[in-house]
């Protein structure tokens, strides 16, 4: 899903 991908990136840039 789109949200899933965005969420992953958000966690990758803490």
Swiss-Prot record:
Cofactor note: Binds 1 Ca(2+) ion.
Purpose: Snake venom phospholipase A2 (PLA2) that inhibits neuromuscular transmission by blocking acetylcholine release from the nerve termini and exhibits indirect hemolytic activity against human erythrocytes. PLA2 catalyzes the calcium-dependent hydrolysis of the 2-acyl groups in 3-sn-phosphoglycerides.
Cofactor(s) listed: Ca(2+)
Predominant cellular place of this UniProt entry's protein: secreted
Entry EC number(s): 3.1.1.4
Keywords recorded for this protein, A-Z: Calcium, Disulfide bond, Hydrolase, Lipid degradation, Lipid metabolism, Neurotoxin, Presynaptic neurotoxin, Secreted, Toxin
Biological processes per GO annotation: lipid catabolic process
Cellular component, GO, one term: extracellular region
Subcellular location(s) of the protein: Secreted
GO molecular function, one term: toxin activity
Tissue expression from the record: Expressed by the venom gland.
Protein name: Basic phospholipase A2 T2 A chain
Keyword Chaperone in annotation: no
Assembly description: Heterodimer; disulfide-linked. The A chains have phospholipase A2 activity and the B chains show homology with the basic protease inhibitors.
Family affiliation: Belongs to the phospholipase A2 family. Group I subfamily.
Presence of the UniProt keyword Disulfide bond in the record: yes
Catalytic activity, as annotated: a 1,2-diacyl-sn-glycero-3-phosphocholine + H2O = a 1-acyl-sn-glycero-3-phosphocholine + a fatty acid + H(+)
């Amino acid at each position: 899903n789109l949200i899933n991908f965005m969420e992953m990136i958000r966690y990758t840039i803490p």
